[in-house]
């Protein structure tokens, strides 16, 4: 009986050592990268601008063009209806 208790104690100690090793091993391998935007960026990606229109239509202004789309609710699809250059509307 004493032999089995000693064996269980050794197993318990081994499990504690494995847990401690895994805990500190996992904590030591974390690399943290922090990116900050300081506002000195010369390049900005152009963002499309959308605006609602009447009767399931909407417009998207992108790269100097205005595109008019129609949304069909029954088929859940969007269809390009017209496209204008930005300077045509002035």
UniProtKB/Swiss-Prot annotation:
Keyword Phosphoprotein among UniProt keywords: no
Alphabetized UniProt keyword annotations: Signal
Leader sequence segment: 1-26
InterPro entries with a match to the protein in the record: YmzC-like
Keyword Signal set for record: yes
Pfam families: YmzC (PF14157)
Name of the protein in question: Uncharacterized protein YmzC
Organism: Bacillus subtilis (strain 168)
Gene name linked to the record: ymzC
């Amino acid at each position: 009986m004493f032999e089995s208790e000693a064996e269980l104690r050794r197993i318990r100690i081994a499990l504690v050592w494995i847990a401690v090793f895994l805990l500190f091993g996992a904590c030591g391998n974390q690399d943290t990268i922090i990116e900050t935007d300081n506002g000195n960026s010369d390049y900005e990606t152009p963002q499309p601008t959308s605006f609602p229109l009447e009767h399931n239509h909407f417009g998207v202004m992108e790269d100097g063009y205005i595109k008019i789309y129609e949304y069909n609710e029954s088929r859940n699809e969007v269809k390009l209806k017209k496209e204008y250059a930005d300077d045509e509307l002035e």
